[in-house]
Design a protein with these regions (language model features):
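Terminal domain-initiation and capping elements
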Residues: 1-120
Length: 120
């Protein structure tokens, strides 16, 4: 097994805790499904949120999905003028037999515009 990294992003419609849980949970579920991963394959997950998100920690959504024994951390994204608002980004470190080129990075909705080179 190799250590790989999977990227993901989602733009929230509004800054509400329940909405964040729903959207980030859906993003994580899609990352796991597209890469044939189970929670045991996760090493750690970094979450970043744009400075306009204040309602909750994105990592709370992972805990609600049952990802309870994986190290998680949240940080604030750089406050860049003109950047897409209300975005949560994910960087998950995983164990996988897949070649790096076969890792499916997931950007949901408008967030797909952030990294057209890797979003699938």
């Amino acid at each position: 097994m190799a250590v790989r990294a999977v990227r993901g992003a989602v733009q929230l419609e509004r800054d509400e805790a329940g909405h964040m849980d729903e959207q980030v949970g859906a993003l994580l579920t899609e990352i796991l499904e597209r890469n044939d991963l189970a929670a045991d394959d996760l090493i750690s997950i970094w979450f970043t949120a744009t400075p306009d998100l204040h309602s909750d920690f994105p990592a709370a959504a992972a805990r609600k999905l049952g990802i309870v024994d994986v190290p998680l951390i949240c940080a604030q994204e750089l406050d860049i003028e003109g950047a897409m608002p209300r975005v949560v980004r994910v960087l998950a470190h995983i164990e996988s037999d897949r070649p790096r080129a076969d890792i499916a990075h997931v950007a949901v909705g408008a967030a797909a515009a952030l990294r057209k080179d890797i979003a699938q």
